[in-house]
């Protein structure tokens, strides 16, 4: 949380704690946050208040673009969660037959650089093997079926945070340079095979930025670090900001 917002947030917290004693508070807070638990309601109201006092976005006017003559149909996939390669192949085949062209496929950091920085071996279930193996197969399958991947780079391993998973498994790493190095490793391995990368997922909602308030300033810092790292190893790559929740 930016330092300038801390005193304001503290005052708001005290006010909300006082309001919570009134009988009408739960219904009012639920209407704004959708939460039923009192502490969750207070946290949601604090997030709303913090968002309302942040500087507004400085956006350029919309620029009309020509229609791109490409297949517009895509789907979220989690092919890495399928244990059996044959079933993974069948899923990709069905997606191609259904008319999809774009697969927004996660390349979760915790499943690639698993136990420490620079270690791309998976030893969770001996014998050890390269953590890249399943992702290599996913890329092979999409190419074989004429599909394209939008690689979602998210979900840090616990070693990237001094407090482990205390702030939740989706909390950002302590050092954004570690994220940049992971993003660069993925982009370098699949240079010329994956063109599109999306950095993080829904960083504007809880708990996608961890068990803490969302922080657009910090996310922007992470986005810039990842962008620079990917473009350095693959100048032709297209780097996308994380998809935002409505």
Feature map (PLM): residue ranges:
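Substrate-binding cleft and catalytic face of glycoside hydrolase catalytic domains
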Residues: 98-121, 125-246
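Sequence-pattern detector for short linear motifs
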Residues: 6-7, 91, 107, 155
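N-terminal Sec-pathway targeting helices
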Residues: 1-14
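Hydrophobic alpha-helical membrane-insertion segments, chiefly the h-region
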Residues: 15-27
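N-terminal carbohydrate-binding accessory modules
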Residues: 26-102, 117-119, 125, 140-144, ...
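Generic serine detector
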Residues: 9, 23, 31, 40, ...
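A generic alpha-helix propensity feature with a strong bias for hydrophobic helices
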Residues: 10, 26-29, 111, 175
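Generic N-terminal simple sequence motifs
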Residues: 3, 19-22, 231
């Amino acid at each position: 949380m930016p330092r300038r917002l801390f005193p304001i947030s503290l005052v708001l917290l005290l006010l909300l704690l006082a309001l919570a004693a009134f009988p009408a508070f739960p219904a009012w807070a639920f209407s704004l946050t959708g939460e039923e638990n009192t502490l969750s309601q207070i946290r949601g109201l604090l997030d709303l208040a913090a968002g309302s006092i942040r500087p507004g976005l400085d956006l350029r006017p919309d620029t009309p673009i020509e229609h791109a003559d490409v297949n517009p149909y895509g789907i979220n996939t989690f092919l890495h969660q399928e244990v059996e390669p044959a079933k993974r192949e069948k899923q990709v085949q069905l997606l191609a037959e259904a008319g999809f062209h774009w697969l927004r496929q996660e390349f979760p950091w915790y499943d690639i650089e698993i136990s420490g920085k620079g270690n791309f071996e998976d030893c969770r279930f001996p014998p050890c093997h390269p953590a890249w193996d399943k992702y290599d197969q996913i890329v092979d399958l999409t190419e074989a079926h004429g599909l394209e991947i939008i690689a979602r780079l998210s979900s840090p391993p616990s070693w990237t945070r001094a407090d482990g998973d205390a702030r939740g498994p989706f909390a950002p790493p302590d050092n954004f340079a570690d994220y940049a190095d992971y993003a660069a490793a993925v982009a370098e391995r699949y240079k010329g095979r994956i063109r599109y990368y999306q950095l993080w997922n829904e960083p504007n909602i809880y708990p996608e930025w961890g068990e803490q308030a969302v922080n657009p300033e910090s996310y922007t810092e992470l986005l810039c670090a990842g962008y620079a790292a990917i473009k350095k190893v693959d100048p032709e790559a297209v780097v996308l900001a994380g998809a935002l929740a409505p």
